């Protein structure tokens, strides 16, 4: 059980919450702050003070005063009118993450909701009732209005949820679980939808998957090094310390560990003086992608614990301030950076695939074919990889450089952070498939070299891979092989370890 405080949530905890289905509870001290802040909102309504989103309309309607008797209707209307999401729904892990992150930000005690609202969010998490949230429709400021409105709908018994493997009306799940829908009171609708939790939840899931792929890429690249009789000298610690990037040093160190007892890697001058860049520069390129991942993780953990509501309430109500913490620019930049980092991991992987299949670049059978000419072998797998990396180059165009005005120019600059987050996730899926193709080719190359000559770690990884796909003894439908390996890579990492096979290092 993870305790949410509003301040301490980590990516590692989110792994357990999203991928293991661990439950959540609220810190009592934080809940007390929520209750105290709520008293301020109720006093504002009672006194008839003019405060944005509590006693006024929203966006361009911020100058329209709302009567005390209409405050509840204002919040309900807000949720219904803003539930304009379109397209396919986010994965369940993402909508689960949105519930968790929205509760966590409320636990900072500056949003002004009742404890009841926080508890309802946590009930949905713990009972695995996940909102159906369309992926498209967010500008990323004022936060993820449309996606979070679909999240808020289900608390009211409206909209749809994923529940026990089915997509059902929210009331079906609430009734079965014995829960009553809530009625929103002053500010609560705004507090539910003003924030960056859609882009951040998708970003967290993307980061988790990207981190796993980055570790896996080192194992796969190591297997390729063996298949191509790569030169291990280029991974010498002195080379990488001389440059000074810790991530580069760490990648080189891990690959040295992976290949320490391999009989297939070579020494400088043994077969050739130096390798092509896609082998020789693995630490430099993969290390740079790790720099991206480290940056992204840092920004995500800040945003996961951030107050992104508006207005925010401080000093016991002495300050109720309209600000712009809902603006998704920090996450938009981070997601665009993640896109570039993962696209490059795929790019260099595709170049290694080419070196594995091109008979002009190695001494292996052409296209790793069992009968070159009669059978095409891995020829078209390289085409597929080339297609994926080219698609990634289009998706890697930064969403964050775009902006378009909304709400009659009141909201005249937006982040497009959710678009960046969604595209990052697609790039990661594509990159995983490219790595799957490299792994299939590297395993085949290793067989030509002799499995007995592989390192202990790569041999273990090879045998695990061969449980997913057989050797290429005849041409077959390789699409199935690629998807099988890609699915295995997606699920073949432990929550507590970097990667099952890597835990032995």
UniProtKB/Swiss-Prot annotation:
Q: Where is the signal peptide?
A: none
The record places the cross-link (5-imidazolinone (Ala-Gly)) at 141-143
Major location, coarse class? cytoplasm
Catalytic activity reads: L-histidine = trans-urocanate + NH4(+)
Q: Quick check: keyword Lyase in the entry?
A: yes
Any one GO MF annotation of this record: histidine ammonia-lyase activity
Q: What CDD domains does UniProt report for this protein, alphabetically? A: PAL-HAL
Q: Which UniProt keywords apply?
A: Cytoplasm, Histidine metabolism, Lyase
Q: Where in the cell is it found?
A: Cytoplasm
Single GO cellular component annotation?
cytoplasm
Q: In which pathway does it act?
A: Amino-acid degradation; L-histidine degradation into L-glutamate; N-formimidoyl-L-glutamate from L-histidine: step 1/3
Q: What is its EC number?
A: 4.3.1.3
Residues annotated as carrying 2,3-didehydroalanine (Ser) in the record are: 142
> What does the record say about PTM?
Contains an active site 4-methylidene-imidazol-5-one (MIO), which is formed autocatalytically by cyclization and dehydration of residues Ala-Ser-Gly.
Q: Which GO terms describe its biological process?
A: L-histidine catabolic process to glutamate and formamide; L-histidine catabolic process to glutamate and formate
What SUPFAM superfamilies does this protein's entry cite?
L-aspartase-like (SSF48557)
Q: What is this protein called?
A: Histidine ammonia-lyase
Which gene is the coding source of this polypeptide chain? Answer: hutH
């Amino acid at each position: 059980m993870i305790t949410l405080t509003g301040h301490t949530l980590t990516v590692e905890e989110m792994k357990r919450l999203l991928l293991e289905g661990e439950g959540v509870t609220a810190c009592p001290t934080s809940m007390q702050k929520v209750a105290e802040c709520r008293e301020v909102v109720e006093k504002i309504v009672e006194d008839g003070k003019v405060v944005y989103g509590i006693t006024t309309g929203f966006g361009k309607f911020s100058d329209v005063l709302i009567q005390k008797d209409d405050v509840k209707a204002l919040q309900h209307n807000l949720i219904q009118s803003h539930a304009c999401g379109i397209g396919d729904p986010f994965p369940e892990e993402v909508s689960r993450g949105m519930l968790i992150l929205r509760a966590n930000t409320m636990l900072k005690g500056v949003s002004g909701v009742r404890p009841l609202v926080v508890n309802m969010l946590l009930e949905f998490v713990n009972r695995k009732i996940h909102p159906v949230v369309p992926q498209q429709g967010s500008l990323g400021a004022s936060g993820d209005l449309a996606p979070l409105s679909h999240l808020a709908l289900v608390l009211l018994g409206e909209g749809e949820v994923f529940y026990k493997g089915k997509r059902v009306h929210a009331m079906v799940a609430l009734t079965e679980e014995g829960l009553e829908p809530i009625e929103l009171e002053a500010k609560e609708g705004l507090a539910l939808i003003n924030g960056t939790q859609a882009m951040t939840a998708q970003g967290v899931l993307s980061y988790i998957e990207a981190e796993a792929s980055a570790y896996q890429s080192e194992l796969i690249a190591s297997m390729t090094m063996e298949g191509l009789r790569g030169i291990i000298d280029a991974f010498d610690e002195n080379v990488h310390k001389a440059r000074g990037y810790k991530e580069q040093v760490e990648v080189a160190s891990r690959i040295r560990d992976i290949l320490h007892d391999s009989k297939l890697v070579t020494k400088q001058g043994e077969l050739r003086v130096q390798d092509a860049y896609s082998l020789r520069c693995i630490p430099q390129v993969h290390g740079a992608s790790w720099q991206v991942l480290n940056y992204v993780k840092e920004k995500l953990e800040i945003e996961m614990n951030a107050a992104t509501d508006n207005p925010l309430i401080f000093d016991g109500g002495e300050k109720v301030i309209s600000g712009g913490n809902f603006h998704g620019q920090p996450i938009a930049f981070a997601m665009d950076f993640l896109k570039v980092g993962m696209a490059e991991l795929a790019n260099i992987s595709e170049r290694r695939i080419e070196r594995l299949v091109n008979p002009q670049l190695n001494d292996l059978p052409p296209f790793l074919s069992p009968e070159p000419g009669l059978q095409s072998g891995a020829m078209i797998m390289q085409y597929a990889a080339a297609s994926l990396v080219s698609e990634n180059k289009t998706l890697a165009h930064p969403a964050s450089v775009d902006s378009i005005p909304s709400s009659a120019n009141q909201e005249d600059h937006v982040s497009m952070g959710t678009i960046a987050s969604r595209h990052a996730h697609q790039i990661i899926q594509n990159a995983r498939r490219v790595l799957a193709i490299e792994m299939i080719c590297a395993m085949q190359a290793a067989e030509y070299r002799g499995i007995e000559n592989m390192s202990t770690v790569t041999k273990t990884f090879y045998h695990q891979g061969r449980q997913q796909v057989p050797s290429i003894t005849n041409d077959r439908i390789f699409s199935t092989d690629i998807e099988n390996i890609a699915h295995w890579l997606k699920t073949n990492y432990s929550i507590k370890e970097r990667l099952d096979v890597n835990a032995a290092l």
